[in-house]
């Protein structure tokens, strides 16, 4: 029985029974063990041609046997070369090749007796390596049946015998190879091989196995290791090209975490920081405060001409006396109608109480029960007309125990300012929509659309996000009619807006929707990578999988704001 490969002329080769430089399996010394295993498996293994040729000098005599590790022994068990389907539970060719790929160690393309020398030649079977690699295109996206046990990774005994730099800085994690998402019967705990007896496991562990077939050699000027560039994460050709241009052969071990050859699983299983992605996503929402603007818009905001405006029942009160209390506010404004008070820090445990012992931050929100109360309040205010912008500011005089006749600013919100449609017949495409954060309170939807259209062009819609009282929450959405304008806006990221009344830096991100992970297509994808190398949705495990690579580790996640807009 043999593993058929094809030589350069397309003819089948037997890498276990023919004289070659390829390391061979020491089957002759294991014949009795194989017969006992075959008997336990109802003689399902084909031993034709096996153990008929002794390991004579000049063929495979120089190979050293490796019998200290159980994992490689199991992953290189004999299997039938016939075209009949394998017995239930036995590993097939794909499974065995998975084990080969996981062992991408220096010198596996040469006999072990010549690992430390430069004389070892590379294998002459590149087509076999390519075919094996093609079967491993995406272990996460294309479930493959895995019918063998999860054995321990190569241990310290191998590191002591062969202390190569890669071994010293690496650790093979079998879970990354064996974590298939297939629902195949051969994956289940009741499959034939997975539920084998302890005696069978003992037989397997006692096998004397030589090194595996050459696979993905790291030497010889190879520019990159396909395994380490994210097998299973479905990096497309653009990603692979970027990785090939960034990772050099000499620095191939430096581009990965020193604790694991297969990326991400240490990070995934980290008990110290299970919510690191969420924390980074929350920090990104305040990124405008610490990042420089890439472009600036300056000018006049569009004039506002209202006919019978309808207001939100919620108004902003700025510049309130520092010693004001909730009782004092209600007593002052209840002449206009029933109301409640919302203090800053509404996300805390007591949103309707002044923070830190009646020490407000200088502003507060009033929520009236009727829109008519807001109209009455505005009529009682003095107005400062801002002729250059067509805006007017409302001020109301109030007093506290220690401050007499203090003017506070009243900022209402007209409901018509929440949405602006430039082309009513244009269909709004979420994939061409951006999220704009850190908006100034004086920016309405029309002004936002005008600014974004001046900068990037193609704006067909702008909307301001509001809470349950239909009052702005400081963010908005802008939809474009073409992909180029959309990508320009996303690439800009931070834009500074300068007007006669205020200067504000806003933050632009892709608009996020509920989506499945675009890598595994199996789990929800709440995390989005805005970097154009990725630019897709990820589940937690796929995010760690892809972004554990050094060239992608600087990417920051985005998440939809989980805080309900009805929280107030």
From Swiss-Prot:
Question: Where does this chain mainly localize?
Answer: cytoplasm
Region annotation (Necessary for degradation by the proteasome) ranges: 181-208
Q: Which residues carry this modification: Phosphoserine?
A: 138, 174, 210, 248
State its location(s).
Cytoplasm; Cytoplasm, Cytoskeleton, Microtubule organizing center, Centrosome; Cytoplasm, Cytoskeleton, Spindle pole; Membrane
Please list the residue ranges that the record marks as compositionally biased, kind Low complexity. 179-195
The alphabetized list of GO BP terms reads: cellular response to amino acid stimulus; cellular response to hypoxia; cellular response to insulin stimulus; midbrain development; mRNA processing; negative regulation of cytoplasmic translation; neural precursor cell proliferation
Q: Which residues bind Zn(2+) 2?
A: 529, 534, 547, 555
Q: What is the protein name for this chain?
A: Cytoplasmic polyadenylation element-binding protein 1-A
Task: Point out the gene that encodes the protein.
Answer: cpeb1-a
